[in-house]
A protein has these predicted regions:
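Extended, subdomain-level signal for the structured scaffold at the beginning of enzyme domains
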Residues: 1-99, 107-111, 127-129, 137, ...
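Solvent-exposed alpha-helices and their adjacent loops that cap or buttress functional pockets
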Residues: 61-62, 141-142, 157
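Short pre-catalytic strand/loop immediately N-terminal to key active-site residues, enriched for Gly-Thr
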Residues: 94-95, 143-149
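Structural detector of well-ordered beta-strand residues that form the stable sheet scaffold
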Residues: 99-100, 121, 138, 149
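Active-site-proximal catalytic alpha-helix in oxidoreductases
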Residues: 106, 149-162
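A conserved active-site-flanking secondary-structure segment within enzyme catalytic domains
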Residues: 115-144
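Generic recognition of short, well-ordered alpha-helical interface segments
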Residues: 121, 125, 156-159, 172
Length: 230
């Protein structure tokens, strides 16, 4: 029987559900995996769609974990100033064997002080903010820096989780899981990265961020100041 391997998904309101359900689908297949969904308040959580998740534990009830996973989403704007959430990331990250993130989750790791001087991936429309926290932005889909694995936007979380699985359980296990979930991306359009997308598509995608850009930038500036003052 495999030894227990504890995985904590540190959630917050208005996450993008695929940011954590993608890696969750992969990582639950690790031998001995025991996955916990947790948030500051625990209980029920609403994501950035109509979906809700219930039965979450409170983050302060989780003592430690082998792997910490931090998703992203528009809720990052509020979470980056949630000191209880950031404190939980610092506490769990200090003992974790692996620290991971998906999408804008790397910005939350950065705000918690866990990425200082590191390289990290992030959603393409947000990754420039990593530099504000002293983190080197990397456009790769998955970036590893020591025990830290960061994924780019949303779907990159599956790639990140498979790389982590290969590190922990070996390539054969990772490839077997990839086949089991039939992860063989073949999108109908070649527009999944900003450098590949047509200009009208890129403009439309950037426009989605406009509604929160000012709020985001102000929140991140305060988060940087708080981290510098710590």
């Amino acid at each position: 029987m495999a030894a227990p391997f504890d995985i904590v998904f540190a959630l917050f309101p208005r996450i993008t559900q695929l940011d954590f359900t993608g890696p969750y689908e992969v990582l639950t297949r690790l031998p001995g995996a025991r996955c916990v969904l947790a948030s500051v308040e625990g209980g029920e959580l609403e994501v950035d769609s109509v979906m809700r998740f219930s039965g979450l534990r409170r983050l302060d009830s989780v003592d430690e974990c082998d792997l910490l996973c931090v998703p992203g989403g528009f809720g990052t704007v509020a979470a980056v100033e949630d000191q209880a959430y950031l404190a939980a990331l610092r506490r769990l990250g200090a003992k974790a064997r692996y620290i991971t993130s998906v999408c804008t989750g790397s910005l939350l790791l950065a705000a918690a002080g866990l990425l200082k001087g590191k390289r990290a991936a992030c959603h393409w429309a947000w990754r420039d903010k990593l530099a504000d926290f002293g983190v080197a932005q990397d456009p790769a889909r998955v970036v590893r820096d020591g025990i830290i694995f960061t994924g780019g936007g949303v779907t990159a979380g599956i790639d990140m989780a498979l790389e982590v699985m290969a590190e922990i359980g070996g390539r054969d296990l990772a490839e077997t899981v990839q086949l089991a979930i039939e992860y063989a991306p073949a999108p109908p359009f070649d527009s999944g990265r900003p450098e590949l997308a047509r200009e009208p598509v890129l403009r439309a995608a950037r426009a989605r961020l406009d509604s929160v850009r000012a709020e985001r930038d102000a929140a991140f500036a305060r988060a940087v100041a708080a981290l510098d003052a710590a």
